[in-house]
Amino acid sequence: MKKLGIIYGFILGVLAINAPEVLPQNTFPSELVNFKEYPGNPIFTGTNVDTWDKQIRERGFILKEGPNYHVWFTGYSPASPTKFLGYATSKDGIHWERFSKETIHPGQWVEDMCVVKSGKTYYMFAEGEGDIAHMLVSKDRVHWQEKGNLDIRKVDGSPIRKGAYGTPTVIQAKGIWHLFYERDDLGIWLATSKDLKTWTNVQDEPVIKMGPDAYDLFAVAMNQVIHYKGLYYGYYHASAFKDWHEWSTNIAVSSDLIHWKKYERNPIIGNNQSSGIVLKDGKGFRLYTMHRKVNLYFSEGASK
């Protein structure tokens, strides 16, 4: 009996470790889910003339440092199949000035990026050719050094299967780097790293799956994860259509970055507005949807 009691206690302990925490009832504050569109949209677009950035696409990424806003974006044109990195700045996060008429990182495919500042270094996680995620680093936001494709391993340490792994989204939590990535937009996986060199899956199944509701039944990909009021919120884009002809912006919440609860009123932004990211703004947030053109939304309490 004593041995059975020990075994039973061990099983309960394992279940407790693996079970998600019970989330409070009001887990989706209004300022994270209720947004009003800025009347001057779009606030940033491709040039629409014959330049390397005639059009923009996928997720760009915005950081605010002091009074200034910085955006990195993906530009492309019919003249080249390669997607290039651009950079622009703003005093108000609405009116933008391109840093250069040329790409700031010529010769390499950089698309769908996430930028994290740690110490004095900027880390960019982006898709390269074939939707393979890679990392670049910078000290000044403009000059970037390539660090190679991300090395992602299964739980057992073996490499993940060959093929695309894109839309890399990274957050630091408790001294650990957490990487969310998708595979053909068919689910969102989570891997962690202590050294930014080798990433290991937390589990080999997606932490966010498609469905069961219609709005994200055919595609999901994480765009940004923030820590707010003790919980983690993930903004992700999704499609309700098998041919992906329309996308939406959605949100989910987690206490541990592994177990996620989707917002029952998703999507929070429809009308084919996707690749959404947020910035704290006064008492609320700004939400930028980045794909094809940048549109801005303000949550209740955000300064205008």
Regions found by a protein language model. Name each.
Residues 7-8, 36:
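Composition-driven detection of intrinsically disordered, low-complexity segments
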Residues 1-4:
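Positively charged n-region of N-terminal signal peptides that target proteins for export
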Residues 8-16:
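Bacterial N-terminal signal peptides
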Residues 6-7, 304:
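Short amphipathic alpha-helical "recognition" segments used for binding
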Residues 23-304:
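Carbohydrate-active catalytic/glycan-binding domains of CAZyme proteins
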